[in-house]
Amino acid sequence: MAMAAASWASSSSFTRFLRPLLSRNSSPSPISYSLHRYKSANCLFFSASSNKPPKLAVYAQARRVLSSKTKGDEIATPADLSFVVPLKIVEYPDPILRAKNKRIDNFDANLKKLVDEMFDIMYKTDGIGLSAPQVGMNVQLMVFNAAGERGEGEEIVLVNPRVSRYSRRIIPYEEGCLSFPMIHGDVKRPESVKVDAQDINGTRFEISLSALPARVFQHEFDHLQGVLFFDKMTDEVLDTIREKLVALEKKYEDRTGLPTPESINTRKIKKAAVGFGKS
């Protein structure tokens, strides 16, 4: 498993395929991910397949768990879960991306419809992962499919997810985000995570993810915490995308007639003021 993860991180051909990570690009050697359930082992197995020998094998063990609600979580109302079709991607610096996301407590046909619509817009915008706040819904819900193609791989839905464990090994990798069109940068993340969540029917389960699925999950989970991927970039990486972030802030002001709710340049000044800026 460690060798497979190392191959995933270091292989140049595989790197080109996955870049930008959360905004799919075409590749002459497509790799698809499938999720298989083995009843005897009660586990899930992500595997990579392509015209070349597989470079990634990710094992994810899942089991039913009983878990109480997280204290202090506000419960989403029917109004919080109402939406208009088609969904639209919310772009930085819209304050929706920073707002607190409410816990889902109603697992009905409306939620299933929302999930379907999220997958639909995700595929149409060439994404492999999407969180509810990215479509204007401040609730704790994410969807992803590492294959990035409808009918391929496996569609994963996580409701009210919580991380119970992160691996100690940290891996840097270039990411993109549907809320930041044409912007990519290196982000360091743990190689694997253990997650407690609910499925579309409200059933709780625990799952361990590694490599690509773990990274996609962490990116989307950050969204549910109001954290954006550039928040975790080094100053050096951030400087390479600063002008594009400023352009998105200007686009927001032009579209809404409102001042930008946050400024990447102000953020840099504040960091410097408390001793974390560049010398």
Swiss-Prot record:
Keywords: Chloroplast, Hydrolase, Iron, Metal-binding, Plastid, Protein biosynthesis, Transit peptide
Range of residues in the leader sequence: none
Domain of life according to the entry: Eukaryota
Location within or outside the cell: Plastid, Chloroplast
Gene Ontology BP terms: translation
EC number(s) from the headed UniProt entry: 3.5.1.88
Cross-referenced Pfam families: Pep_deformylase
GO MF annotation list: metal ion binding; peptide deformylase activity
Family: Belongs to the polypeptide deformylase family.
Protein name: Peptide deformylase 1B, chloroplastic
